[in-house]
Amino acid sequence: MKRKKSSRRSQAGFSLIELLIVVAIIGILAAVAAPRLLNYLKLGRETATINSLRTIHQNEATFSATRARFGTLKELQEFGLLDPNYANGAGVSGFVYNSPEATADKYCVQATRQTETTANRDFNVIEDGTIRYVEAKSPAPIPHGEGTPLSDTGGTTTPGAAPAAQPPKS
C-alpha cells in the first residue's frame, strides 16, 4: 500500500504573509483613526465642562437670591446646589473647578484642564452667564471675564438665571 504524503497546502488556515497583511492594514486604520478619536474625546470633555459651567451659573443665581451675594464653589456645595467633586478640587471630566472670586456683585468660576491631553481650552463663567475660553494653558487663575466668549465662535451664552440684584448706586 502506498501512503499519500500529506501536503501542507491542504491544511486549513492562514499563511504568515496573509496575517502580516491584515496586521498592517489594521495598523494603518488605527493610525488614521486614533487622532480623530482623541479629538472627539477632547470635544466631549469640553462640552461636558461647558454644561457644568451653565449649571453652576444657574446655581449661583439660586444662591444669590437667598443670600444676596454670590457664593464660592464650597458654599454652593454646602448649600446643596453642587456636587462635592466640583468644590474639593478632585476634578470632573478632566477639569478642576475653582472660584477665585465671589462677592455681592460678581463671581468667576474657572474650569482648568488637568493636562494638555484633556482638552484644548480652559473655561470660565462670570455673573452675566457668559462662558469664555482661553486656548493657552492657564498656570494661574484667569482674570475676571478674560477670554473669548463662546458666542464669538457660534456658541451661546447661558440663558435663564439672572445675576444677583445690584446694590443701589449712591
Pin down the residues of each PLM region:
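Alpha-helical hydrophobic helix detector
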Residues: 20-36
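A short acidic/small-residue loop/turn micro-motif
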Residues: 138-141
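Aliphatic-rich helix starts adjacent to a transmembrane/signal segment
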Residues: 36-53
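N-terminal leader/signal peptides at the extreme start of proteins
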Residues: 1-14
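Phosphate-coordinating loops and pocket residues in cytosolic domains that bind phosphorylated ligands
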Residues: 34, 39, 75-78
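Extracellular/periplasmic head regions of type IV pilus-like filament subunits
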Residues: 58-131, 135, 147-170
